[in-house]
């Protein structure tokens, strides 16, 4: 019941965005929101069905968090964000953005994709250069049916600890990455006047590390440039890794006064019968965070979340029933500022 003061990257964020931010910080005291990537678009054995998700097929309820990719954004995805907002859910946007230097038609994968780590960030940072102007055109905002900005969590340069992407550990220097992150924030916030974004950084945390907090803060752009700290956790069955990294991210959250969450996780079509209650829920109860987001269910060989017929389906129903897990119907108004909280 003590007054709480939080700070955001954008002091001019809309009231709804500030309220979402405050609730993301506080909700970890209540439980953990479950999210699923691309859940309204497709699932196992279906594509494009209205108001459907694999999670809803199992539980009758949608995930609390809708994770989607800004890559090839279209009206369908934008409408899913609008519908999620109307129902009271939360949207988090990742961005597998093409390499602006090498992208183009008739390229052989991975040339031109996110996975093409050809160096380009140094060119983007040159004001007025071809790559600088091209990249500025890519950045855009999203609005609801009435033209009001919908609050979203945005993680544009995810897994920057890795070498697979063109903004990552081998394609940029530390100074270039930090400058690039700040360039994105400054352009959206100060030039475009976008005030509905919660800026999230999300290193990949798959192993037990000697200095997990140091890895979480790898190439940290500065407290004034990050709102939310996520981590992408593909640790397989290494429970020690998940526990130790959850402990570290909770410590960072307490120190920085910022919300945190597991922004990607899951086992690719390799769930045990007690996966959700043992491998996922048990550690989260010990080290609570705002959300845990399973990666997508594209097909039976590439499925990270639950679905009917999966070995973990019955266990997920128990996961759903647990008072600690939060799904869409469990959410109070995430876009109303809780009492006793101020944002600066």
Say what each PLM segment does:
Residues 2-58, 62-72:
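Boundary/entry segment of secreted carbohydrate-active catalytic domains
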Residues 19, 46-55, 75-79, 134, ...:
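Alpha-helical scaffolding within the catalytic cores
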